[in-house]
UniProtKB/Swiss-Prot annotation:
Residues 344-478 are annotated as: Cytidylyltransferase. Coiled coil: none annotated. It comes from Pectobacterium carotovorum subsp. carotovorum (strain PC1). This is Bifunctional protein HldE. The keyword ATP-binding applies. Keywords: ATP-binding, Carbohydrate metabolism, Kinase, Multifunctional enzyme, Nucleotide-binding, Nucleotidyltransferase, Transferase. The keyword Nucleotide-binding applies. GO terms for molecular function: ATP binding; heptose 7-phosphate kinase activity; heptose-1-phosphate adenylyltransferase activity; phosphotransferase activity, alcohol group as acceptor. In the N-terminal section; belongs to the carbohydrate kinase PfkB family. In the C-terminal section; belongs to the cytidylyltransferase family. The gene is hldE.
Length: 478
């Protein structure tokens, strides 16, 4: 599936649900307590992060989308910390303050990247008047493209059915991260996003893919859902919709350090993408990519548009764009470990034109990754003459790196990239023009390594020299 990142700045999302403050105490552990057989942590760092529904709102804001948050808090330091931290990341908070209850707080103690214990400070908000929340939803509906209901069973969504119907009447899709085994309370929602254990707690244990799909589709029908997205950890995600074939998205996670808040990231990216105009299938693809990024971070985290862009292009771990030769070697090694085919080409690319773009796009189609090696300014001057290059090396590389077809851009100082090609040893070496394969610098090294050498045609009439001559001719007429 080819998906382009939407302009999230055009999207507005309201998150309603159980907000909480996540506190983290970090420190080294070097001994066991004499009081009990437990480690002693010498706390040297304390962090506070918005969690629960607040983490969903932060994930939406991190993408650049308009993010609004409604929830229940106490009147205490934790509530003030939430307001302050969310304000810093452009989340518009409209909390309902309940003076008789504390703000939900979860304290985690960690040492050496391992969580040792979690302590919860909370009292349920059950029985709280729902009208202030309903009124806040009604006020926000004209300004949003999606409503997220983030349920942690703490009481903020006690009247969830009223919220669903209110949004549906306004034509706003409702996405719900469910809690518990009573999915009937979410009847009529646009999308539910249970994880596998939550799904099987309702539908029963599924031994096969067919069984999972069959039971999932039954839930969709029983509860009048538009769609069901089952998040399945290392098995990826499965999207079920009435009248459509199941869509399975394999996981994109490379390493898993912490799954805290991963579900918040999934539904946040889903909502922002839908509000920005992406179809549901594309929104799920983006959410799956975002989940693969966030589980590689410690603690509740967000994903930026750049991280998401890297992930959907499969470059989150290897990097992309302009690189040194050493950085490129490491990136190529990681790509090869995943079985990816490396394509390499080279040139001056002084004034980028349609012929270059078409050529690079065709080169990229030959494999999974495209390296563009670029002549330095001195090298270009030796090859093209004293008036070249028109554009200096840094500018040429930045423009090349911005092309969708190009993964990595690397400079070289010599007249030919033979040494660089021998160092990288691409699977396919490509050159444009009227060359014979044996005339291409680096071809012998690539062939000796079992690789291929190909010649691609340039578009007729497209050349840097022609562009320069046209500019000169027009200038002489004026």
């Amino acid at each position: 599936m080819k998906v382009t990142l939407p302009d999230f700045r055009q999207a507005g999302v309201l998150v309603v649900g159980d907000v909480m403050l996540d506190r983290y105490w970090y420190g080294p552990t070097s001994r066991i307590s004499p009081e009990a057989p437990v480690p002693v942590v010498k706390v040297d760092t304390i962090e506070e992060r918005p969690g629960g529904a607040a983490n969903v709102a932060m994930n939406i804001a991190a993408l650049g989308a308009g993010s609004r948050l409604v929830g229940l808090t106490g009147i205490d330091d934790a509530a003030r910390a939430l307001n302050a931290k969310l304000g810093e990341v452009n989340v518009k908070c409209d909390f309902v303050s309940v003076p008789t209850h504390p703000t939900i707080t979860k304290l985690r103690v960690l040492s050496r990247n391992q969580q040792l214990i979690r302590l919860d400070f909370e009292e349920g908000f059950e029985g709280i008047d729902p009208q202030p929340i309903i009124e806040r939803i009604q006020l926000a509906l004209p300004k949003i493209g999606a409503l997220v209901l983030s349920d942690y069973a703490k009481g903020a969504l006690a009247h969830v059915q009223t919220m669903i119907q209110t949004a549906k009447a306004a034509g706003v899709p409702v996405l719900i991260d469910p809690k518990g085994t009573d999915f009937a309370r979410y009847r009529g929602a646009t999308l539910l996003t249970p994880n596998l254990s939550e799904f099987e707690a309702v539908a029963g244990r599924c031994k096969t893919e067919e069984e999972l799909v069959e039971r999932g589709m039954q839930l969709v029908a029983d509860y009048e859902l538009s769609a069901l997205l089952i998040t399945r950890s290392e098995q990826g995600m499965t999207l079920l919709q009435p009248g459509k074939a199941p869509l399975h998205l394999p996981t994109q996670a490379q390493e898993v350090y912490d799954v805290t808040g991963a579900g918040d990231t999934v539904i946040g990216v889903l909502a922002a993408a839908l509000a920005a105009g992406n179809p549901l299938e594309e929104a799920c693809f983006l959410a799956n990519a975002a989940a693969g990024v966030v589980v590689g971070k410690l603690g509740t985290s967000t994903v930026t548009p750049i991280e998401l862009e890297n992930a959907i292009r499969g470059r989150a771990d290897t990097g992309f764009g302009v690189m040194t030769e050493e950085q490129l070697k490491k990136a190529v090694e990681l790509a090869r470990q995943r079985g990816e085919k490396i394509v390499m080409t080279n040139g001056c690319f002084d004034i980028l034109h349609a012929g270059h773009v078409s050529y690079l796009a065709n080169a990229r189609k030959l494999g999974d990754r495209l390296i563009v090696a670029v002549n330095s300014d001195a090298s270009t001057k030796r090859l093209k003459g004293p008036t070249r290059p028109v554009n200096p090396l840094p500018q040429r590389m930045i423009v090349l790196g911005a092309l969708e077809a190009v993964d990595w851009v690397v400079p070289f100082e010599e007249d030919t990239p033979q040494r660089l090609i021998a160092s990288i040893l691409p699977d396919i070496l490509v050159k444009g023009g009227d060359y014979q394969p044996h005339e291409i610098a680096g071809s012998e090294e690539v062939w000796a390594n079992g690789g291929e050498v190909k010649v691609l045609n340039f578009e007729d009439g497209c050349s840097t020299t022609n562009i320069i001559n046209t500019i000169k001719a027009n200038a002489s007429k004026s």
